[in-house]
């Protein structure tokens, strides 16, 4: 995979973590909002003020609706559509508070209901705004069995899955394109209703082992005397697209973003981070022990002797420990320009002579009819890692034991990648390591796993299905207008920043103007001819899940290799339409908001602006601010790494960024301190995005009733609702194990600190909620970059 392609709003929900195939990632997952009935006793005195106000509101609303129904039925023949709009005009009297009635249309009532189900009025918003906004949500939404995290993102994602499932299970003749029919065939092969996978057992993998060149663990065709690492690596990388030892792909050149280039980076670890190999905590030791058990179980299922397999897999882990010791931590990989090392392949061969690099890449490119010579320029992002890796491998290749360990490691990378495509005993084998790693052994409904997997494989074909079913056309222009307003607010704020010099400020405004945005979905997916072209070379066969995954890997590899001599298409989407996320790509200077996130609770054109700007507006501001975070700021308006900042402004930017890093490093969760340096870019984007969205909201208030009248049952102004809407996006519950995993691997801060950290830096929040100086949510020292 490419090293640094895009910066996403949340951690990507994929089917694997750190190389281990899992059913659920560290991102936000979950489903339906739960509705709870009121308690049966109707004791007025026992009700609090909010409940009494709700009862009064409900009574008034019931009479209003009854009156309106009479009007509707007695005037049913009228052709004047305006007479049938269920709208209540505000009144200036007969209100319990002495104010006008709240907004009582169905959208306001629903929005109010959702907020009230989450909010905890017993918590002082100036002490803990996350608890104030989310405690009731957390109480009423325990993590379901089989899940490791449960939140707003996951609920919406799983509702999207249900929409997709309902279509995928329709007859093939109902689909509009061959690509969509391929999605259906793949989905059904994953469901495996006829249990073809169970009947085949280990056979597909054992057949593959022979094609790879054998495996010492299972005594399947491996001969140490004539085995070479370079030959096996060619097969794994260049034929089957398996990740091992290091990562490489064709990506956009950071210093010339109009062209593609071969990119090479560190890699090779199966567990999420190096810490898991070094037994830094009890949890790390537990995960490592379960990893050994997982490896051993799979080997035995493939025919190996248990004790012999365990011994050989411990050898693999010891090799991975060596990789862990030379792996550069995430927090030390944030300087884009410092990591960029272009060199010819002949130079790389001198740096890391364990591999004939020219031969390796020439072999890969033959798939698309392209030759590679010693003069080919590649970009290396971790030269020290490759040099150290070379030293390790050259030493191991000098002994028979070392060569056996290398064979075991390389083939294991293929085996563990495909265990989820085999029979149930193989799929169950990793439940233990998943439980240790994430606090849950999985167990979601098979159809959900298969919808997610189909999304990963033919995501734009599935996207066509989703868009036709769920995306409303009016959302796109409304979202585009919101982005324009937030961009304008961001630029206006730039004018007020005294720490940025005039020339840098002008160039920053130019870059902000140059940011392109893509919303909803790419147009071509609704054109069956164009969609079929995208997946024309992908072969999907009924009842052949294992082989289908092999074909998908080959298709993805070939698609990537074809890019090398092609100019960069800056309108290509890097995320499918049904995804509940958003991203910024620095080499394209582009922000993207898929249809999947342009839904309630993030966005609804019928909602008050305060709610839309607090939720979706902050997402938009977040992605826009990524263009100016500690990594994005290194790219100019054309998407190229270029020193366009004045040195004094860089110095002041670094000082302000250090304040953010210190702030978040001061937060603790489950006894562990957050890594503010690792999460710096996301924290800068969170803070800047919130500020831009709030200022845009204040500048664009409308005179619609929904934007003026209070929501029923909520004694909150719309400025306060903006912040509540923002916070409730992050309501979630997570296992302790997943919290640890996120703190060690995720570039985003945990949910509660994405709320507390940002709001405590924002003076407007303190003013709106009247938080006294020195309160937790209004500290005297605040951090601000943008």
From Swiss-Prot:
Keyword Glycoprotein found: yes
Annotated disulfide bonds: 103-108, 126-771, 134-731, 190-450, 659-783
Binding sites annotated in the UniProt record for Zn(2+): 622, 626, 682
Listed cofactors: Zn(2+)
Glycan attachment residues as annotated in the record: 216, 226, 256, 279, 305, 325, 356, 388, 496, 569, 715
Transmembrane feature ranges: 53-73
EC nos: 3.4.24.11
Similarity annotation: Belongs to the peptidase M13 family.
Catalytic activity: Preferential cleavage of polypeptides between hydrophobic residues, particularly with Phe or Tyr at P1'
Entry note: cofactor: Binds 1 zinc ion per subunit.
Extracellular side: 74-786
Protein name: Neprilysin-3
Molecular-function GO terms, alphabetical: metal ion binding; metalloendopeptidase activity; metallopeptidase activity
InterPro entries, sorted: MetalloPept_cat_dom_sf (IPR024079), Peptidase_M13 (IPR000718), Peptidase_M13_C (IPR018497), Peptidase_M13_dom_2 (IPR042089), Peptidase_M13_N (IPR008753)
PROSITE patterns in alphabetical order: NEPRILYSIN (PS51885), ZINC_PROTEASE (PS00142)
């Amino acid at each position: 995979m490419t090293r640094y392609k895009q910066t996403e709003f949340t951690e990507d929900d994929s089917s694997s973590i750190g190389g281990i195939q899992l059913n659920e990632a560290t991102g936000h997952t979950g489903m339906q909002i739960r509705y709870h009935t009121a308690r049966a006793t109707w004791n007025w005195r026992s009700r609090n003020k909010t409940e009494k106000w709700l009862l009064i509101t409900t009574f008034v609303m019931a009479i209003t609706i009854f009156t309106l129904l009479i009007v509707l039925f007695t005037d049913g023949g009228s052709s004047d559509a305006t007479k049938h709009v269920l709208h209540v005009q505000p009144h200036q009297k007969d209100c319990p508070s002495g104010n006008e009635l709240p907004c009582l249309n169905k959208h306001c009532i629903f929005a109010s209901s959702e907020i009230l189900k989450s909010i905890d009025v017993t918590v002082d918003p100036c002490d803990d705004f996350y608890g104030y906004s989310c405690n009731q949500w957390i109480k009423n939404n325990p993590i379901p069995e089989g899940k490791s995290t449960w939140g707003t993102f996951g609920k919406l994602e799983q509702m999207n899955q249900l929409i997709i499932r309902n279509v995928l299970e329709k007859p093939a003749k109902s689909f509009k394109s061959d690509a969509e029919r391929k999605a259906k065939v793949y989905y059904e092969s994953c469901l495996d209703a006829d249990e073809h996978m169970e009947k085949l057992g280990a056979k597909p993998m054992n057949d593959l082992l022979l094609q790879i060149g054998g495996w010492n663990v299972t005594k399947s065709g491996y001969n140490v005397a004539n085995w070479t690492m370079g030959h096996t690596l060619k097969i794994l990388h260049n034929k089957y697209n398996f990740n091992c030892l290091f990562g490489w792909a064709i990506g956009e050149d950071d210093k010339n973003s109009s062209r593609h280039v071969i990119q090479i980076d560190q890699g090779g670890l199966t567990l999420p981070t190096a810490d898991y190999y070094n037994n830094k905590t009890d949890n790390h030791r537990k995960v490592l022990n379960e990893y050994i058990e997982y490896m051993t179980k799979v080997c035995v299922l493939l025919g190996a002797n248990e004790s012999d397999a365990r011994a050989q897999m411990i050898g693999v882990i010891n090799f991975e420990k060596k990789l862990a010791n030379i792996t550069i931590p995430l927090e030390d990989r944030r300087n884009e320009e410092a990591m960029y090392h272009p060199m010819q392949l002949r130079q790389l061969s001198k740096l890391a002579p364990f591999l004939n690099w020219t031969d390796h890449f020439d072999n890969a490119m033959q798939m698309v009819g392209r030759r590679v010579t010693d003069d080919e320029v590649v970009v290396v992002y971790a030269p020290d890692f490759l040099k150290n890796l070379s030293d390790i491998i050259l030493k191991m290749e000098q002994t028979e034991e070392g060569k056996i360990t290398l064979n075991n490691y390389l083939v294991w990378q293929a085996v563990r990648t495909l265990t989820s495509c085999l029979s149930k005993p193989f799929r169950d084998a990793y439940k233990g390591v998943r439980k240790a790693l994430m606090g849950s052994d999985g167990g979601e409904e098979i159809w959900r796993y298969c919808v997610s997997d189909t999304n990963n494989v033919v995501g734009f074909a599935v996207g066509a299905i989703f868009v036709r079913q769920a995306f409303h056309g009016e959302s796109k222009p409304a979202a585009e207008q919101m982005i324009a307003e937030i961009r304008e607010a961001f630029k206006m704020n730039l004018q007020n920043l005294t720490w940025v010099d005039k020339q840098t400020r002008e160039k920053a405004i130019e870059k902000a103007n140059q940011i392109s945005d893509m919303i909803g979905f790419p147009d071509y997916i609704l054109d069956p001819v164009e969609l079929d072209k995208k997946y024309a070379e992908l072969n999907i066969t009924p009842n052949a899940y294992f082989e289908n995954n092999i074909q998908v890997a080959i298709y993805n590899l070939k698609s990537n290799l074809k890019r090398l001599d092609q100019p960069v298409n800056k309108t290509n989407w890097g995320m499918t339409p049904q995804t509940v996320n958003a991203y910024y790509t620095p080499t394209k200077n582009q922000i993207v908001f898929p249809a999947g996130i342009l839904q309630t609770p993030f966005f609804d054109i019928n909602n008050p602006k305060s709610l839309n700007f607090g939720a979706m507006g902050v997402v938009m501001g977040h992605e826009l601010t990524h263009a100016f975070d500690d990594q994005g700021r290194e790219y100019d308006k054309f998407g190229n790494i270029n020193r366009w900042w004045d040195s004094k402004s860089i110095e002041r930017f670094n000082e302000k960024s250090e304040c953010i890093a210190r702030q978040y490093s001061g937060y603790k969760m489950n006894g562990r301190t957050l890594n503010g340096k690792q999460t710096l870019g996301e924290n800068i984007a969170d803070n800047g995005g919130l500020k831009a969205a709030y200022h845009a909201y204040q500048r664009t208030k409308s005179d619609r009733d929904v934007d003026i009248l209070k929501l029923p049952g909520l004694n909150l102004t719309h400025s306060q609702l903006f912040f509540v809407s923002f916070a409730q996006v992050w309501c979630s519950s997570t296992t302790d194990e997943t919290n640890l995993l996120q703190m060690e691997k995720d570039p985003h801060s945990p949910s509660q600190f994405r709320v507390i950290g940002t709001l405590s830096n924002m003076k407007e929040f303190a003013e709106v909620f009247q938080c006294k100086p020195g309160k937790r949510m209004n500290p005297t020292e605040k951090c601000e970059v943008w």
